[in-house]
């Protein structure tokens, strides 16, 4: 019997599919990645081809093993993490999608959402699903597909069609259609799932006219769902034993499994999640209530705040403003000046997300005087990422009544030392940057490994969560509050910029 030395994490993201091999010490042995096409049929619409998602993801799995020179029988288990909310409907018999995947960013269901608001469902949806009414979530996307593909609703009622988020689709394909399953974290992003009863919500299914027959079974984030053969029939059967949506996987990968622990992922946007333990905290401050993973993958709750523009505002400095050649240059130029010279940049290019939720806000630069140069603007843009994070954190502390002691960070922008130091300064809190930056894949691997006994419990992993660097606040409270007050003033003036009819 070959020794099972490794765990594979499949990380199916918005722009690429990745596979990561990890050993028992949580070291990354090899990584394989393939990008796939973004389809934009109309302005504001975003789709993916589900067959291409499957093709890229399955090929990275084969590639990553070949790269590491590892045979399939050395793999103890596979964990899956995925872009959340993205919606796929396919034929049970053939495994063929009846429409492209409708991606989380897609805004085509705005009108359905307006109807839900007009029907007075906001409070029901917030109380029972933990979400706000927005095209972001899967429910209205499923309705759209059933409304627009002829005969599909009847076929779904007859049990001929299946719905799934990306995790469900991948497992269906990996098990040759034997297993139709999702986990609590992904289900909590559909707007069809009751986060208190932990079951599909009959009222939401009725409102959106979605047949229950097409929905997957919902399971814990860490258990064996089925087996997959790597290398076709007769190949080694490997358990698939971990599933979590990408942000929840990152929370678990950062080992934020105790009440009050939080992480912030700095990507295109920012996603901050705080574990609230066994209490589902209803937000009064513009956050989402969502499901997270406890220490053994059981149901915990979390508060989540999404900021639309983080890394994207650095890309704007590079691509549109041409102030830098490379995102990495932003740190160099920002540190060429002592401060922003009174300038604030509000990067509300597509409106503002949490905690404001103002689609009519637009980007702005305030406080310009004759002495302001490009470096001040670069610095102010970086600072805006930290200010927006404080906005979300203040909302979290108000909702949860928990004071944060340290913020764990991950994502591309955490390599920027200036930003991380300023983040600590403006929060007045320690910022902890981990050694391993691949925390989303780590989370999926941990969930899978725990389910099959590859790791006994999280205590084994605690020492693996090495903090590479800790940033501590370096400014006085009065200075911090003065700067943050300036930011609040700037945001207020950027809000409701686009005229709209009441």
Swiss-Prot record:
Glycerol binds at residues 84-85, 136, 246-247. Coiled coil: none annotated. One of its GO terms (molecular function) is ATP binding. It catalyses: glycerol + ATP = sn-glycerol 3-phosphate + ADP + H(+). GO terms for biological process: glycerol catabolic process; glycerol metabolic process; glycerol-3-phosphate metabolic process. Its EC number is 2.7.1.30. The keyword Translocase does not apply. ADP binds at residues 14, 18, 268, 311, 412, 416. Sn-glycerol 3-phosphate binds at residues 14, 84-85, 136, 246. Activity of this regulatory enzyme is affected by several metabolites. Allosterically and non-competitively inhibited by fructose 1,6-bisphosphate (FBP) and unphosphorylated phosphocarrier protein EIIA-Glc (III-Glc), an integral component of the bacterial phosphotransferase (PTS) system. Keywords: Allosteric enzyme, ATP-binding, Glycerol metabolism, Kinase, Metal-binding, Nucleotide-binding, Transferase, Zinc. The keyword Disulfide bond does not apply. ATP binds at residues 14-16, 268, 311, 315, 412. It is an enzyme of class 2 (transferase). InterPro entries: ATPase_NBD, Carb_kinase_FGGY, Carb_kinase_FGGY_CS, FGGY_C, FGGY_N, Glycerol_kin. One of its GO terms (cellular component) is cytosol. Pathway: Polyol metabolism; glycerol degradation via glycerol kinase pathway; sn-glycerol 3-phosphate from glycerol: step 1/1. It comes from the Bacteria. Pfam families: FGGY_C, FGGY_N. Belongs to the FGGY kinase family. HAMAP family: Glycerol_kin. Homotetramer and homodimer (in equilibrium). Heterodimer with EIIA-Glc. Binds 1 zinc ion per glycerol kinase EIIA-Glc dimer. The zinc ion is important for dimerization. Key enzyme in the regulation of glycerol uptake and metabolism. Catalyzes the phosphorylation of glycerol to yield sn-glycerol 3-phosphate. This is Glycerol kinase. It comes from Escherichia coli O7:K1 (strain IAI39 / ExPEC).
